[in-house]
Amino acid sequence: MQKIKVLCVDDSALIRSLMTEIINSQPDMTVVATAPDPLVARELIKQHNPDVLTLDVEMPRMDGLDFLEKLMRLRPMPVVMVSSLTERGSEITLRALELGAVDFVTKPRVGIRDGMLDYAEKLADKIRAASRARVRQAPQPQAAARSADSAAAAPMINNPLVSTEKLIIIGASTGGTEAIREVLTPLPPDAPAVLIAQHMPPGFTKSFAQRLNGLCRIAVKEAEHGERVLPGHAYIAPGHAHLLLARSGANYIAQLSDEPPVNRHRPSVDVLFRSAATHAGKNAIGVILTGMGRDGAAGLLEMKRAGAHTFAQDEASCIVFGMPREAIALGGADEVAPLADMSRRVMARLATMGDRVQRV
């Protein structure tokens, strides 16, 4: 079996050494070269033709974002960003995902062995997924402007969807930040409440919510424990907790849980979907988007069995066709839709629900 060829780009010799040690310990991948900055990396890419690039966010001579933008325009390839757990680091990482990076990992903590096995497993999984990922070219400025214009001009649904009884429940992983943006930006201000579980570490989900809030016509925020779930709002699971839907009388509320990871994830899509199956039933729409693994597949099936209408993103538009594929294989998806049409299909389905609000 041919090994996945990886090029590691980081200005820290210690980080380059640690990443090399982790990657070379895997049976199916190898580091073909390392580079201290993007200018050296540019020549090594020509020489080694790597399958995956790991790229530090902030470096001398040329920062990671500038290099990524040029790379995705001139020679698109799978890139996994390596980021620090800081507010600035999370904002830059989200911008990198917009520019076409497949995924990101936090920097390994040099000299601290606790948690290193878990980190190594996550890094290897992300590199494997990236090697199979569908790579997007960097968006042109005109395309971004058209996207914003189309979101502003998205048609309103004739029947205002203001009932808290209707909910959109979304789960995603690898490639999900951009997929979620594409689903949320066309939603009208009176759309039903949206609850989202996106696999992200602590510290990144708040920046993700803030970025979406500036792009969407609905309000987007990081979910808080016990808050009421309202129409026209989207609630993103914090990176350290499971997000669950619950009821308080006639109202829906968000609950956060620090229970152990499910499917190796916290937040877990399955946890969110199962809570929606229990407390929303026929009043919910379930959507599973791009991502590796199977988290959310069983939960989407539970939502469907509880009466919810369910969607899975199609293979052609997924960065990684893992979670949707598993959901489809289990029979959990009522419809399979391309990402570009997902928001319209969801809103059209909600419009057909009319006043058929079911109490559960």
Curated annotation (Swiss-Prot):
One term of GO molecular function: protein-glutamine glutaminase activity
Residues of the active site: S173, H199, D295
Organism this protein belongs to: Burkholderia orbicola (strain AU 1054)
Enzyme Commission identifier(s): 3.1.1.61, 3.5.1.44
Major location category of this protein: cytoplasm
Classification via PANTHER family: PROTEIN-GLUTAMATE METHYLESTERASE/PROTEIN-GLUTAMINE GLUTAMINASE (PTHR42872), PROTEIN-GLUTAMATE METHYLESTERASE_PROTEIN-GLUTAMINE GLUTAMINASE (PTHR42872:SF6)
Family: Belongs to the CheB family.
Keywords assigned: Chemotaxis, Cytoplasm, Hydrolase, Phosphoprotein
Keyword Phosphoprotein on entry: yes
Short name of one Pfam family: CheB_methylest
Domain notes: Contains a C-terminal catalytic domain, and an N-terminal region which modulates catalytic activity.
CDD domains tied to this protein: CheB_Rec, REC_CheB-like
CheB-type methylesterase domain ranges (all copies): 161-353
Gene Ontology terms describing biological process: chemotaxis
UniProt function note: Involved in chemotaxis. Part of a chemotaxis signal transduction system that modulates chemotaxis in response to various stimuli. Catalyzes the demethylation of specific methylglutamate residues introduced into the chemoreceptors (methyl-accepting chemotaxis proteins or MCP) by CheR. Also mediates the irreversible deamidation of specific glutamine residues to glutamic acid.
SMART domains in the cross-refs: REC
Span of domain Response regulatory: 5-122
Name the record gives this protein: Protein-glutamate methylesterase/protein-glutamine glutaminase 1
Gene designation: cheB1
